[in-house]
Amino acid sequence: MASYAQGIDALNQSLSEVKGIDVSFEFFPPKTELMEKTLWKSVERLAPLKPSYMSVTYGANSGERDRTHDVVKRIQAETGIKAVPHLTCVDATREELIEIAKDYWQSG
């Protein structure tokens, strides 16, 4: 009987060999230091599968917005994989949303 780790490795190998199917991964911005370590271990493990992009959820409060932005920029910088933020229009003015979008565009 295959172990859980062997099953995951087999699935990862299968995904890396699939052609014609776009795969992406979604992450939540970390709220604690432990969650941040887990996030980056996950990104490192999944990046070799060459997903079309990695997305990061986006909360309405400014602290989570900043964490989302930091994660998106770091994913792109460290992996070269497109990173896509979720944008939430709740609790933000039109002007704030324009500035947030401009910042993402300028970051690549």
Show which residues each predicted segment covers:
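Short secondary-structure capping/turn segments at boundaries of alpha-helices and beta-strands
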Residues: 11, 42-43, 72
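Glycine-rich, proline-tolerant flexible connector loops at the mouths of alpha/beta enzymes
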Residues: 30-31, 50-71
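An N-terminal assembly and electron-transfer interface module characteristic of large anaerobic redox
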Residues: 2-4, 66, 105
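N-terminal amphipathic alpha-helix/helix-capping segment at the start of soluble metabolic enzymes
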Residues: 1-25, 32, 76
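Alpha-helix-loop-beta-strand connector modules within alpha/beta enzyme cores
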Residues: 17, 62-85
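Hydrophobic faces of well-ordered beta-strands that scaffold small-molecule active sites
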Residues: 21-29, 54-56, 83-87
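Acidic, glycine-rich active-site loops and adjacent beta-strand->loop/helix elements
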Residues: 60, 89-94
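Alpha/beta enzyme core
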Residues: 17-22, 31-54, 77-78, 94-108
